Amino acid sequence: MVQVDLITGFLGAGKTTFLRRYAAWWAGQGVKVCVLENDFGAVNVDAMLLQDLEAQGVELETISGGCDCDTHQRRMRTKLISMAMRGFERVIVEPSGIFDVDEFFDVLRDEPLDRWYQLGNVIAIVDALLPEELSPQAEYILASESAWAGSVLLSRCQLASDAQKQGAEAHLARALEACKCSRKFGPKEIIAKDWADLTGDDMARIAKCGYRQASCEKLHFEEHDAFASAYFLELGLSRARLERNIPSLFGDAACGRVLRVKGFVEDGGQWYELNATAAGLTAAPIPQGQQVLIVIGEGLDKARLEEELKR
C-alpha cells in the first residue's frame, strides 16, 4: 500500500519550509514521492515555493481550497485516485493552515482509497512564537491539527527564547485540553531545535514517528466564514515598500485580524517570496513568481488593507 503522510500546522507555522526538507529526504532514500499541496483560497501560492523539488525527483500535485467542503473532498479524492495509479511509494499531503483533518481521514476511509493507501506519519508544525491568544476557531484548529500527530516540530526556534518555546508547548496543551482531547505530548515527541541543525538521524526519527488516534470535541463552523482571504494582483509595489508596510497590518484593527500575508514580488529581475506573520517577515529568493499578495485572517477589510499596503 502507498504510505501517505500528513503535515499539519496553523497559518504561517512553517509547513511548506519543512515539507521541502522532508520530501527531499525521502527522495534521497530512493523513494518515489509525490506531494499533494492544498492551499486556503483559490490561488495556490505555496505550490510555487516547491518548484525546486521537481529537480530532486519529487512530483507535485495541487488542490486550491477556494470551494465548499464537499467539492474539496471530491477534488482530493480524485487526486488521490489518480496518484495511486502512478506508482508512487509515498504521498505527502500538506493541507492549508485552516483545515479540518477529519475531512482528510474521511477521504482515506472511502473505497477504493482504503485499499490503496495507508496512513504513515502525521507531523504537526507549531510556531515557537505562537501568539498567547487566538480566537476560539483558531484554538480549535491548532488542537485538531495536532491531535493525531506522532511528532510535533517547533518552528522558528532560532528566534525564540527557551521561555517562548515552553510557552508554545503549554499553549498547545491548553488548546487540546479545551477541546476535551486526551492527547498529551511527551518530551520525546516534541522536537524544539533550529531546523538548520536537523540531522539525518533527526529526519529518520521524524520519518517513522507514526500517528496517534485521538479526537477533539467538534467546534462547528465554516472555515470560509470564520477565516477570509484577500487577494491583491498586480499591485505594482516595490519590495522595499511591501516590507515596510506589511508588518503594520498585524497591529491595525481596522484591517481585521490579520494572521498571515504571503505572496511574491520582483526586485531587480529577481523574484522573492514574501511570508509574514505577527512574529516577523521574511523575503527569500525563488526561481519564479507572479505578482500576487494574499492576506489571510478574520474579519478582513480589503479596502483598508489595500490602503495600508499602498501608503
Region locations from a protein language model:
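Conserved residues at beta->alpha junctions
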Residues: 10, 37, 95, 156, ...
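Flexible glycine-/small-residue-rich
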Residues: 37, 126, 276-278, 297
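Short aromatic/hydrophobic contact patches that present stacked aromatics
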Residues: 92, 228-230, 294
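C-terminal engagement modules used by replication, chromatin/transcription, nuclear envelope/ESCRT
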Residues: 288-296
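Short amphipathic alpha-helical segment that frequently serves as the phosphate-/nucleotide-binding helix
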Residues: 16-20, 139, 169, 243-246
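C-terminal accessory "lid"/substrate-recognition subdomains
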Residues: 148-154, 158-288, 300-303, 307-311
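Nucleotide-state-sensitive switch-loop elements of NTP-binding domains
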Residues: 2-13, 17-135
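Conserved C-terminal guanine-recognition region of P-loop GTPase G domains, centered on the G4
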Residues: 83, 98-184
